[in-house]
Amino acid sequence: MNYLVMVSFALLLMTGVESVRDGYIALPHNCAYGCLLNEFCNDLCTKNGAKIGYCNIQGKYGNACWCIELPDNVPIRVPGRCHPS
């Protein structure tokens, strides 16, 4: 039984686990991508590995792109100020 658990654990480590989340895709300095059209956001999100994206009109950060199932390696907007350069 212990052998089966160890083999399963080793396989899990070797294959890795890709996790995803939903959120506003972020520019550098914690700024959300502004939008007017769903097509812009869908293209942006899917090019960054998300399942789909759309323009969230009048959302928490104004008109901004919301991505569904965005990979963890792509930054999302987090609470706090946007600091454009």
UniProtKB/Swiss-Prot annotation:
UniProt cross-references to Pfam families, sorted A to Z: Toxin_3
Record-level GO BP terms: defense response
Lineage: superkingdom: Eukaryota
Keyword annotations of the record: Disulfide bond, Ion channel impairing toxin, Neurotoxin, Secreted, Signal, Toxin, Voltage-gated sodium channel impairing toxin
LCN-type CS-alpha/beta domain span: 21-83
Phosphoprotein in keyword set: no
SUPFAM superfamilies: Scorpion toxin-like (SSF57095)
Signal peptide: 1-19
Disulfide-linked positions: C31-C82, C35-C55, C41-C65, C45-C67
GO molecular function: sodium channel inhibitor activity; toxin activity
Subcellular localization, as worded in the UniProt entry: Secreted
Cellular component GO terms held in the UniProt record: extracellular region
Tissue: Expressed by the venom gland.
Spans through the membrane: none
Main localisation: secreted
Domain note: Has the structural arrangement of an alpha-helix connected to antiparallel beta-sheets by disulfide bonds (CS-alpha/beta).
Function: Alpha toxins bind voltage-independently at site-3 of sodium channels (Nav) and inhibit the inactivation of the activated channels, thereby blocking neuronal transmission.
Membership in a protein family: Belongs to the long (4 C-C) scorpion toxin superfamily. Sodium channel inhibitor family. Alpha subfamily.
Protein name per Swiss-Prot or TrEMBL: Toxin BmKaTx10
Organism per entry: Olivierus martensii (Manchurian scorpion)
